[in-house]
């Protein structure tokens, strides 16, 4: 399924977990949002007992980066979240940052259809640390899901 098949492709930003968003706010608050960041995607064990997997999902990655936006509804939802100690979980200035968020990262990936093996990098993302943080969960979900399905 291409990301363009999703009825609302801008909703991709919320295909994450709260950890990624709170870490992004921490990077933003500490002034480290634009420091160089990098993460790699790999799998630990052979999916479904096979000796290898077939890389899938890399064709979707540029679209993922391009469509990573926070809708007004996303911002309203995030603004409604309460911190465990009380008060707003996300600062209004950080939510303003997310309103205009655009990712500018570099992605290096094993080509679509190539064999991949456990503990070997399949994808490497480099760029501003906050942008990498917000892309991590969605990217891992796409690549690892497609690749594990191809191994089945």
Language-model features: locations:
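Ordered alpha/beta subdomains of enzyme catalytic regions
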Residues: 1-148
